[in-house]
A protein has these predicted regions:
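N-terminal short leaders/motifs
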Residues: 1-14, 82-95, 127-133, 198-223
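Short Pro/Gly-enriched beta-strand edge/turn motifs at strand-loop
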Residues: 27-36, 109-115, 237-242
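Residue-level detector of conserved, well-ordered beta-strand and adjacent loop positions
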Residues: 34, 79, 259
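Rieske [2Fe-2S] iron-sulfur-binding domain
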Residues: 38-144, 150-151, 155
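C-terminal catalytic domain of Rieske-type non-heme iron oxygenases
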Residues: 58, 63, 69, 132-133, ...
């Protein structure tokens, strides 16, 4: 793995690469779109994922479902975005009154006897996306060619399955914008070379001495395992497409992801989960403060890297503690190759877009 080089800096900028990331690379994977606590049976939730308006529904007695948030008649959204689910029996288009159940089936269209052509309700259901629950999150896939969720979360299921399936209570969350390409933030969170240096009083105290670092890899996941000062294992997973999971020995989970926003900006989303009644509000607040402290330390670093990754920059040689970066970058190279484009071709597109 160490005979690889880092991705060229040109892949971290330019609209051509940004569009490929959100419209092609992203379609190879499942995406967590809401904590399960944000949607209950009999509710709907409007969200936006990668600039695409979506509608989550949970028909009573069934599993959650996901649809494009647009009426098949003229494309108007059924609902505007909201933080949590809202009770709903039927979805009614505000434009022409087409009415759907939570399964996405058309129940009625206003004055449907007056359409010029024969009108069949069954032909006008909502456009559905694959949707399922795994761990404390609701997931969707934009394409039927996406990796299976079992493959995407393989190491999580095998190494932290108990915590993953029991820490279902969302305690705290945070969302902020970073002035860097998402790949820079993702690389940084996979970078075990910098923790002892950049986070001596924060994350380093959780992960412990570098000599105790143990790495594991599956085809699509990587894992840093360290002994926690309080006993047990502290696990840090790197997951496609741009996600990270931290697991404490007591079963707490921190889910972190870097969502592409623009070529030079991404959105950092953090969710903290634990079992029911695992901690009081003050303890949860303190946990969030601790997480945001080390993430603020990283913010300064990744935004500086974005400035450094100008078109004449070539990244230096990888260190053995940067193997997790190389692992995911290898997967990214494969996706570029499967699209029929070499690294050099994509780099040229990115540079051309930057100069145009």
């Amino acid at each position: 793995m160490l005979n690889q080089t880092f991705l060229p800096a040109s892949l971290y900028r330019g609209d051509a690469m940004h569009q490929w990331d959100i419209h092609t690379y992203a379609n190879h994977y499942w995406h967590p779109v809401a904590p399960i606590s944000h949607l209950q049976p009999g509710e709907v939730l409007a969200i936006t994922m990668l600039d695409q308006p979506l509608l989550l529904t949970w028909p009573t007695g069934e599993h959650p479902r996901a649809f494009r948030n647009r009426c098949p008649h003229r494309g108007v959204a059924f609902r505007q975005g909201g933080g949590t689910g809202q009770s709903c029996r039927r979805l009614v288009c505000p434009y022409h009154g087409w009415t759907y159940n939570l399964r996405g089936e058309l129940l009625a269209a206003a004055r449907e006897a007056d359409f010029e052509q024969d009108f069949d309700r069954q032909g006008w259901g909502l456009q559905e996306l694959a949707c399922r629950i795994d761990g404390p999150l609701i997931w969707i896939a934009f394409s039927d060619q996406a990796l299976t969720l079992e493959e995407q979360l393989q190491l999580v299921h095998t190494e932290a399955g108990a915590a993953w399936n029991t820490a279902s209570t969302l305690l705290r969350q945070s969302r902020s914008s970073l002035a860097c390409n998402w790949k820079i933030a993702h690389d940084n969170t996979l970078d075990d070379y910098h923790v002892a240096i950049a986070h001596p009083t924060t994350l380093h105290r959780e992960q412990g001495p570098v000599r105790d670092y143990r790495h594991r890899f599956s085809q699509h996941n990587n894992l840093l395992e360290t002994p926690h000062p309080d006993g047990g294992r502290f696990l840090t997973f790197g997951l496609p497409p741009w996600s990270h999971l931290l697991v404490w020995p007591d079963g707490r989970l921190a889910w972190l992801e870097f969502m592409p926003e623009r070529p030079d900006r991404c959105t950092m989303q953090l969710h903290l989960f634990a079992g029911s009644d695992a901690m009081d509000a003050a303890t949860a607040d303190a946990w969030l403060r601790d997480m945001l402290t080390f993430l603020d330390e990283d913010k300064a670093l990744v935004e500086s890297v974005q400035q450094g990754y100008q078109e004449d920059f070539q990244p230096g040689p990888p260190h053995q503690l940067e193997r997790r970066i190389l692992h995911w970058q290898g997967l990214y190279r494969e996706r570029l190759g499967s699209a029929g484009n070499s690294i050099e071709e994509r780099s040229h597109e990115a540079i051309s877009a930057l100069r145009s």
